[in-house]
Regions:
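Feature captures the catalytic ectodomains and active-site-proximal regions of enzymes
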Residues: 1-513
Length: 513
């Protein structure tokens, strides 16, 4: 008889780094995790690069991690897919891109591109912008403008100026394009309905409102001098002869080159929704609006360049087909990850799948100001679910190591790690009490490296470090094999539950007897 419930606990952004310097995982007091790693089956798992369908050496991220876990197989990511299409030349024949181009040609209007300008590879990749510039050049367009969203989370906090300078050099080399506006992702890429931020971004893009600068790099440097790094650069427009270089207006084409949906939805809604109540928008602009991927199927008036490749028989579907009950628990910041992404990009819950959302704190601008976030509330719900006897499977995410790690504030990251450790302790007690089994892992690293070891600058991005795989309260004869990746976790749980792995899942169980 298999144990019940089976809990998958995801410690978001909790990587393992042999260098203890500026490493919150190492520096925090973590008696629970230390004990589990020494007394339970424990190995390091891969959560980056080819092991999760990303280019070699590319750090993992939450979307990719949860997608690979839930699918029980390596899912080739949009980044890899789009880069490959540029290399193969298919990119230049994508019908939606050609529709945008034709609209500009026919009406003599401008082609605008916007998105994150960095090589972070989480939401976008700068080489994809170069592909779009090449596309514009091949099609003879001359009114081509890029609106740059600066990163500083998946890249160093003041690397944006360099990325924009590189972009401008590429524009010269290819022979087309100008930078029209610049803003931090804090404004343009909110995902928490903080519409006041999105409004500032939208008004810069469509009305030329905001700060002014004579050049993009000059404006970014001014922002740095003012103590605002990439993520927080207040929207500014680049002026030409005393006027904004370009604003998005009726008749133009827009290509939004972010491929990750969660932080692309709000600004897209501001442009595309016929009825929009996020802020007071004058009117819906008449545009050809192309998204790299489908950010949300409920957003209307948009074209999608790279359609979703469907993933069949995810863990959620598999459990539903076998009449098993399941619950997903997370706070707001990671709720989409344990639901939408874990289910292979499907919003609709499976039969027998409950969802518990604990609101993330709204009263702080950045989570270093509240590193415990809503972890205790999430943990309360977890313990309740474990003891309820209602569920065969519980999937839980603790957001703190990732969300606080992104701030680069070391004391706060340590507090985040310690908060989560205490929560893990409560879960372990509950699991032992009901004689269930728990698999603890992370989706990628982050909190275990908070400075760039070469430059000494704050390091706020994810890492390529391995993550913990820990098996708690399983049959004592089980060990875990080395060399596993995120795609192997669900096959492991399926074996623990005494069930047969579906053929669609190509991951391999980590259990060794």
């Amino acid at each position: 008889m298999s144990k019940k419930p089976t809990v998958l606990m995801i410690l978001d952004g909790y990587g393992l780094n042999s260098n203890c310097d500026h490493n919150a995982v190492c520096e925090g007091r973590t008696p629970v995790m230390d004990q589990l790693m020494s007394q339970c089956p424990f190995v390091k798992g891969e959560a980056s690069g080819m092991a999760v369908g990303l280019p070699e050496g590319q750090m993992g991220n939450s979307e990719v991690g949860h997608l690979n876990m839930g699918a029980g197989r390596i899912v080739y990511q949009e980044l890899t897919r789009i880069t490959k299409s540029i290399q193969d030349g298919d990119f230049f024949q994508v019908p939606e891109f050609l529709t945008a181009v034709e609209n500009c040609k026919k009406n003599g209007t401008a082609l605008h591109m916007f998105g994150l300008v960095s090589d972070g590879g989480v939401h976008s990749h700068n080489t994809h912008i170069y592909g779009l510039l090449e596309l514009a050049k091949r099609n003879g367009l001359d009114k081509v403008y890029v609106h740059c969203f600066l990163d500083g989370r998946d890249t160093p906090p003041e690397s944006g100026k360099g990325f924009v300078a590189e972009l401008e050099a590429k524009m010269k080399e290819i022979g087309v394009g100008e930078v029209a506006s610049v803003m931090g992702r804090y404004y343009a890429m909110d995902r928490d309905k903080r519409w006041d931020r999105v409004e500032l971004a939208y008004n810069a893009l469509t009305k030329g409102q905001g700060n002014q600068a004579q050049s993009a790099t000059e404006g970014i440097q001014d922002s740095y001098d003012d103590g605002k790094a990439d993520e927080f650069v207040v929207p500014f427009v680049v002026e030409k002869e005393g006027k904004p270089t370009a604003v998005i207006q009726d008749g133009d084409s827009v290509i939004f080159y972010n491929f990750r949906p969660d932080r692309a939805r709000e600004i897209t809604r501001a442009f595309c929704d016929t009825v929009f109540d996020g802020f007071a928008r004058d009117k819906k602009l008449d545009l050809v609006f192309v998204c790299f991927t489908d950010y949300d199927e409920t957003i209307e008036n948009k074209l999608v360049a790279f359609k979703k490749e469907s993933i069949t028989n995810t863990f959620g579907e598999f459990l539903a087909a076998h009449d098993k009950t399941q619950v997903r628990i997370a706070e707001t910041e990671k709720y989409a990850h344990v639901t939408f992404f874990f289910n292979g990009g499907v919003e609709e819950p499976n039969k027998g799948e409950d969802r518990i959302l604990v609101p993330s704190p709204k009263e702080v601008a950045t989570y270093d100001l509240k590193p415990e976030m809503s972890a205790v509330g999430v943990c309360d719900k977890l313990v309740e679910a474990i003891k309820s006897g209602k569920y065969d499977v519980i999937i839980i995410n603790f957001a703190n190591p990732d969300m606080v790690g992104h701030t680069g504030v070391e004391d706060a990251a340590i507090k985040a790690i310690e908060t989560v450790d205490a929560c893990v302790g409560r879960a372990v007690e509950a699991i032992k009490e009901v004689d269930g089994v728990m698999f603890i892992c992370a989706d990628h690293g982050n909190a275990e490296q908070l400075v760039d070891y070469e430059t000494g600058e704050p390091f706020t991005a994810h890492t390529t470090n391995p993550v913990p795989f820990i098996l708690v309260n399983a049959d004592p004869s089980y060990k875990l094999r080395e060399g596993g990746a995120l795609c192997d976790i669900i096959p492991t749980l399926i074996e623990l539950m005494g069930m047969e792995q579906p053929k669609e899942m190509t991951g391999k169980s980590l259990l060794v007897k």
